Amino acid sequence: MDQTFRPKKSLGQHFLKDTAIAYRIVKLLDIHEGENIFEIGPGQGALTRHIYGYNPGQLLLVEKDSCWVDYHSSVKQQNVSKVTIHHLDALKFSWETLCGSWKVISNLPYNVGSALIWDIVSRVQSMSRAVFMVQKEVADRLCACPGTKSYGVLSVWVQSFAKVEWGFIVKPHSFYPQPKVDSAIVTLYPKPREEQPKNSKTFAWIIKQCFQHRRKQMQSILRKIGFLNYYESLERIGISPSARPESLSNQLFQQLSQEFLLQLIDFPKKT
């Protein structure tokens, strides 16, 4: 797949040109023959051509750039017969429609990487594993532990739905055109449903409210958002009233979200 098109800055396109790196990324997905693979933004096919070599059962490609949609449409019959190509912005894809078991992979554009991962971990019920290349700063946030500078809303949200594993750093010279920052690979392993947030809308609202004031004490934040009997709830969960959001684990935030629901408080419907 050596056909080239001019990268579109408006789409945040940086094409991976290092075949060795592409091979390492796909290998992390641990594809077995016959498994279903979902690739977001295949572009010139740096990852796709390695995926073909594993003889997947179904290969679903979502591509926003019409040039690359045409390209992959022209080559798909040469490889895997069960290839479906959607000409679509991945942010608008109906993730709930995926049936069966899927593995997801992508070199995500920097400008939409966080938003896509947010959606995927909480909406794809049939995902067994995902491998993403993102801006290193985003990877740091995805893997961050409580009490660290990078720990925040994205960390808590994603780690509540999946185990996140750091892969490796990819330097700018591996791309065309070269980005100004390093990229990094992360692998996500979805957690069992019983370990995930029970009400994702409430959970999202709670963590966003808390991290808007990450340096304030929890008792002040909960009082401000109208959390009734917050002191008793904090004591029941085992959170100090003087604790700050950045020090709490995703499990504690999930328990706090459940306590909030029990208060029968009206909470915003938008997340």
From Swiss-Prot:
PROSITE patterns: RRNA_A_DIMETH, SAM_RNA_A_N6_MT
Top-level taxonomic group: Bacteria
EC number: 2.1.1.182
Localization terms from the record: Cytoplasm
Gene Ontology molecular-function annotations: 16S rRNA (adenine(1518)-N(6)/adenine(1519)-N(6))-dimethyltransferase activity; RNA binding
Enzyme class label: transferase
GO cellular component labels: cytosol
Keyword annotations from UniProtKB, A to Z: Cytoplasm, Methyltransferase, RNA-binding, rRNA processing, S-adenosyl-L-methionine, Transferase
InterPro entries, sorted: KsgA/Erm (IPR001737), rRNA_Ade_diMease-like_C (IPR023165), rRNA_Ade_Mease_Trfase_CS (IPR020596), rRNA_Ade_methylase_Trfase_N (IPR020598), rRNA_adenine_dimethylase (IPR011530), SAM-dependent_MTases_sf (IPR029063)
Claim: Cytoplasm is one of the keywords in the record: yes
Residue positions binding S-adenosyl-L-methionine: 14, 16, 41, 63, 89, 107
Predominant location: cytoplasm
Keyword Acyltransferase: no
Enzymatic reactions: adenosine(1518)/adenosine(1519) in 16S rRNA + 4 S-adenosyl-L-methionine = N(6)-dimethyladenosine(1518)/N(6)-dimethyladenosine(1519) in 16S rRNA + 4 S-adenosyl-L-homocysteine + 4 H(+)
SUPFAM superfamilies with a match to the protein in the record: S-adenosyl-L-methionine-dependent methyltransferases (SSF53335)
Job of this protein: Specifically dimethylates two adjacent adenosines (A1518 and A1519) in the loop of a conserved hairpin near the 3'-end of 16S rRNA in the 30S particle. May play a critical role in biogenesis of 30S subunits.
Protein family: Belongs to the class I-like SAM-binding methyltransferase superfamily. rRNA adenine N(6)-methyltransferase family. RsmA subfamily.
The protein's name: Ribosomal RNA small subunit methyltransferase A
Species annotation: Lawsonia intracellularis (strain PHE/MN1-00)
